[in-house]
From Swiss-Prot:
Source organism: Bdellovibrio bacteriovorus (strain ATCC 15356 / DSM 50701 / NCIMB 9529 / HD100)
Gene: rpmC
HAMAP family named among the record's database cross-references: Ribosomal_uL29 (MF_00374)
Molecular function per GO: structural constituent of ribosome
Pfam families listed in its UniProt record: Ribosomal_L29
GO biological process, one term: translation
Protein name as annotated: Large ribosomal subunit protein uL29
Segments forming a coiled coil: none
Cellular component terms (Gene Ontology): ribonucleoprotein complex; ribosome
Keywords recorded for this protein, A-Z: Ribonucleoprotein, Ribosomal protein
Length: 63
């Protein structure tokens, strides 16, 4: 997910997106622990997307 896509969303939309990605990250971690995750690099991407969203939320609230 690109930061350009994220910065155009409202704070409420960002929070919903963050919640969805957090749930997806949780599921990916469970699958990875039992060996069913085919692409473990996906976890890193999800963590980075959540961090980008958190950054965008802080920037919007600071305005």
């Amino acid at each position: 997910m690109k930061f350009v896509e994220i910065k155009d969303l409202s704070v409420a939309e960002l929070k919903k997106k963050r919640a969805a990605l957090s749930e997806e990250l949780f599921q990916a971690r469970i699958k990875n622990s039992i060996g069913q995750l085919s692409n473990p690099v996906q976890i890193r991407g999800l963590r980075r997307d959540i961090a980008k969203i958190n950054t965008a939320i802080v920037k919007k609230v600071a305005r």
